[in-house]
Amino acid sequence: MAKAATRSRTKRAKRTVVDGIAHINATFNNTIITITDRQGNGLAWASAGGSGFRGSRKSTPFAAQVASERAGRAALDYGLKNLEVRVKGPGPGRESAVRALNAVGYRITNISDVSPIPHNGCRPPKKRRV
């Protein structure tokens, strides 16, 4: 019986990126933070649900802050220094996610709101009756 050849794997060095973009998608139910390079290639991401918050606790500003810190720390391995922040959506975690990225140690160069605004497009959901 022939022996299987064992191949030693060399660990590939992570590329260094200085400038990046933090995409914050803040919905009413969750907050998702994705950190990319300038071309849009993903470096790190985190969400409030993936950070251990379930149910109604996912949609809190604190959950968005924790998720933002996790994504920010994961992207530090790439040597990221400057971040441009793009916020999308009406959720409660918009501002706290930006503050958390600032607290991690990034230099935030620009904050822009890229929420989709309909020019009288689809009919919105009906009002809630609680």
Curated annotation (Swiss-Prot):
Tagged with keyword Cell wall biogenesis/degradation = no
Per its UniProt entry, which superkingdom is the organism in? Bacteria
Q: Which GO terms describe its biological process?
A: translation
What Pfam families does the database record attribute to this sequence? Ribosomal_S11
Q: Does the keyword Ribosomal protein apply?
A: yes
InterPro entries per the UniProt record, alphabetical: Ribosomal_uS11, Ribosomal_uS11_bac-type, Ribosomal_uS11_CS, Ribosomal_uS11_sf
A GO cellular component term found in this entry reads: ribonucleoprotein complex
Keyword set for this entry? Ribonucleoprotein, Ribosomal protein, RNA-binding, rRNA-binding
MF term (GO), any: rRNA binding
> What task does this protein carry out?
Located on the platform of the 30S subunit, it bridges several disparate RNA helices of the 16S rRNA. Forms part of the Shine-Dalgarno cleft in the 70S ribosome.
Q: Which family does it belong to?
A: Belongs to the universal ribosomal protein uS11 family.
Instruction: Fetch the PANTHER family from UniProt.
Output: 40S RIBOSOMAL PROTEIN S14/30S RIBOSOMAL PROTEIN S11
Q: How does it assemble?
A: Part of the 30S ribosomal subunit. Interacts with proteins S7 and S18. Binds to IF-3.
Q: NCBIfam families, from UniProt?
A: PRK05309.1 (NF003698), uS11_bact (TIGR03632)
What name goes with this protein? Answer: Small ribosomal subunit protein uS11
Protein species of origin? Alkalilimnicola ehrlichii (strain ATCC BAA-1101 / DSM 17681 / MLHE-1)
Q: Gene that codes for this? A: rpsK
